[in-house]
């Protein structure tokens, strides 16, 4: 058995793999609106949740192409909160992480249409249902329970201790 870890933009790296050549894909794509890696066209800084979901569906169509017929996909995808604030959030290039309600990329964050400020956006559910509609099997959700989660400064909801 061999393991190969591919590093780079998934949209480019997957194209180099032959059809049906992957036994198992394990991934944690950038979460929507939470981090700026300082790369043009990066995943996670789409203008809307719907645009992010569309990108994820496109990416996972390519994952499906390279997976063997008996292959499996393991996807870890966290959520984010709707926020609207009048100031610029600086880039996180270099590794600093935004808090869960902050926009990324030095852009003013806005509340996505149909949501209210502080709403949990439901990105993992939106992506899961979109992938299911695109032909993927949704077999199980597995909770990653974190006994020592990252502290948060929020006072109007519980600290997130799972993904």
Describe each PLM feature range.
Residues 1-163:
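Core catalytic lobe of class I
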């Amino acid at each position: 058995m061999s393991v190969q870890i591919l590093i780079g933009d998934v949209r480019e790296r997957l194209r180099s793999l032959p059809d049906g050549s992957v036994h198992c894909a394990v991934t944690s794509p950038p979460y929507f609106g939470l981090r700026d890696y300082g790369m043009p066209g990066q995943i996670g800084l789409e203008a809307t949740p719907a645009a992010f979901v569309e990108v994820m569906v496109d990416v996972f169509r390519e994952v499906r192409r390279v997976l063997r017929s008996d292959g499996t996909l393991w996807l870890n995808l966290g959520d984010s909160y709707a926020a609207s604030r009048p100031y610029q959030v600086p880039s996180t290039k270099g590794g600093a992480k935004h808090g869960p309600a902050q926009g990324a990329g030095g852009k003013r964050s806005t509340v996505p249409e149909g949501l209210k400020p502080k709403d949990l956006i439901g990105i993992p559910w939106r992506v899961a249902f979109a992938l299911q509609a695109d032909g993927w099997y949704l077999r199980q959700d597995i909770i990653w329970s974190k006994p020592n989660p990252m502290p948060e400064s929020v006072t109007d909801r519980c600290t997130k201790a799972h993904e």
